[in-house]
Amino acid sequence: MKSVFLRAAGLLALCAVFGYIVLAALPLFRPRLETIRLERITVRDTVPVWGVFLREELVLPASDCLFRQPEASRISAGAELAPGLRSPSAGIYTAWLDGYEHLSAPALTVPALRALCGDRRMPLGSPGKLITSSRFDFYALAESAAAAGLTPGSRCTLECSYWGGIELQLTEIGESWQDFTPLHFSGSGDMDMVMYLRQVSGVLLLGEYTGLRLPDSALYTENDVLYTDVLTIGELQRTPVHVLYDAGDYK
């Protein structure tokens, strides 16, 4: 009887020791959590472009008379510009001439846009020109891969290093050729800025998004809903994610 009791006591002691070892080892078998610190960032969705501005421009006839109008002044039709010279139309006056005032809307193809500024005709003796409409066009080339997401009717902002943003609307997309896509934009207003622009390299700002950057490895889908796990005061909380911008390897 005594030996049975001793064997039972030894078994209980062994179980107690083994149980302690199992409990102590449990943390070793828990999955390791990888945590990241969330960073708030702003992402700009842009497309690099090169293009040409066209507008309604009326070159004034050559004159030896002293011109009386200041730069960028608004001129009414029939106003006296100089002795013996009256304005044939209303518009904004500028003395800036670049030899491309005769250009008209090109075919919306890559070769046509590349050749658009190949014919330069500098007016001789002219005191300047009138910009006779507040509307303008911008014909541009973009790499086809970058322009793949563009759709007619969408609005964007053209930014270049030496001018502020110009609001544009995409009116037409031409056929891609040699990895480039021709684009036709229209706009209005901002003529005090636009009247000095012709050939421009810049970027189209399609959108700007501010949010928390998350790598794809931190996201999972359940019942068609995208989630991530947020560690708050030592507890994991499943949190739905609304994607503002998908950069490929992070959102």
Please provide the spans of the model-predicted regions.
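Short, well-ordered beta-strand segments in soluble/periplasmic domains
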Residues: 95, 122-161, 166-174, 180-191, ...
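N-terminal beta-strand block that forms a small beta-sandwich/beta-barrel module immediately after a flexible targeting
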Residues: 19-65, 80, 93
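Surface-exposed patches in structured soluble domains
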Residues: 52, 76, 86-141
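Exposed loop and linker-edge segments at protein-protein interfaces
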Residues: 67-84, 240, 251
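Short coil-to-beta transition motif at edge beta-strands of beta-rich domains
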Residues: 70-80, 146-159, 224-227
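Short, solvent-exposed secondary-structure boundary/capping segments
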Residues: 46, 50, 59-62, 98-108, ...
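Hydrophobic membrane-insertion alpha-helices, especially the h-region
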Residues: 9-23
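Edge-of-domain interaction segments
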Residues: 19-37, 188-251
